């Protein structure tokens, strides 16, 4: 997992609330379990509309999604996180996220930033007025900065530490690989074993 310390990028203003995971990526995209190749499924139904915000040329290459409240509701699917990342988003800003989506995001390296709705509105206005405006999300300082906007955000210490160090569940486990191997070597042969394939 790539470490996240600070990111500056242009933004997509997604003025929709209650965006569920099926809208983020429809169920027919969930047949594979690799983490890549989901960018075309991101907001698939909405992208059929030529006026949808992601279809606008001035939004191409944007890396910050500024979403409406209750983003990521619905069923738990890591594919929704992977689709956002595959498209190029490094962080999502909203006034409220579904708990399971937020947990999946943080465990997969996508920083979800909760700001009050007034601040989200100010970011929307800024990036709609100037599509080239950049937003900085600084995890070290726990701050979002843009022209005319400076806002602090909270994130639990464990999630912050994992993101700053680029650590997912597997990489954290592998930090103890020698201890795991030593333990397995001493286990009686009649007990179940893990075997590298």
Curated annotation (Swiss-Prot):
GO BP annotations, alphabetical order: L-leucine biosynthetic process
Residue ranges crossing the lipid bilayer per the database entry: none
Keywords: Amino-acid biosynthesis, Branched-chain amino acid biosynthesis, Leucine biosynthesis, Lyase
InterPro entries: 3-IsopropMal_deHydase_ssu, Aconitase/3IPM_dehydase_swvl, AconitaseA/IPMdHydase_ssu_swvl, IPMI_Swivel, LeuD
GO cellular component, one term: 3-isopropylmalate dehydratase complex
Record's catalysed reaction(s): (2R,3S)-3-isopropylmalate = (2S)-2-isopropylmalate
GO molecular function, one term: 3-isopropylmalate dehydratase activity
Enzyme class label: lyase
Disulphide-bridged cysteine pairs: none
EC number: 4.2.1.33
SUPFAM superfamilies, per database record: LeuD/IlvD-like
Pathway: Amino-acid biosynthesis; L-leucine biosynthesis; L-leucine from 3-methyl-2-oxobutanoate: step 2/4
Family: Belongs to the LeuD family. LeuD type 1 subfamily.
Matches recorded under HAMAP family: LeuD_type1
Job description of the protein: Catalyzes the isomerization between 2-isopropylmalate and 3-isopropylmalate, via the formation of 2-isopropylmaleate.
Subunit structure: Heterodimer of LeuC and LeuD.
Protein name: 3-isopropylmalate dehydratase small subunit
Species in which this protein is naturally found: Streptomyces coelicolor (strain ATCC BAA-471 / A3(2) / M145)
């Amino acid at each position: 997992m790539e470490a996240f310390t600070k990111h500056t990028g242009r933004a997509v203003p997604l003025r929709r609330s209650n965006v569920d995971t099926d809208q983020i990526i429809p169920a027919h995209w969930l047949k594979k379990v690799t983490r890549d190749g989901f960018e075309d499924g991101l907001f698939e139904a909405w992208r059929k509309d030529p006026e949808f915000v992601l279809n606008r040329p001035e939004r191409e290459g944007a890396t910050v999604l500024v979403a409406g409240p209750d983003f990521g509701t619905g069923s738990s699917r890591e594919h929704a996180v992977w689709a956002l990342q595959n498209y190029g988003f490094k962080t999502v800003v909203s006034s409220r996220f579904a708990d399971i989506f937020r947990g999946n995001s943080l465990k997969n390296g996508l920083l979800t930033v909760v700001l009050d709705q007034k601040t989200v509105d100010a970011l929307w206005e800024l990036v709609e007025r100037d599509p080239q405006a950049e937003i900085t999300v600084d995890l070290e300082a726990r701050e979002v900065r843009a022209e005319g906007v400076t806002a602090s955000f909270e994130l639990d210490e464990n999630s912050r530490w994992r993101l700053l160090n680029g650590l997912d569940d597997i990489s954290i486990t592998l930090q103890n690989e020698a201890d795991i191997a030593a333990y397995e070597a001493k286990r009686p042969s009649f007990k179940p074993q893990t075997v590298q394939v």
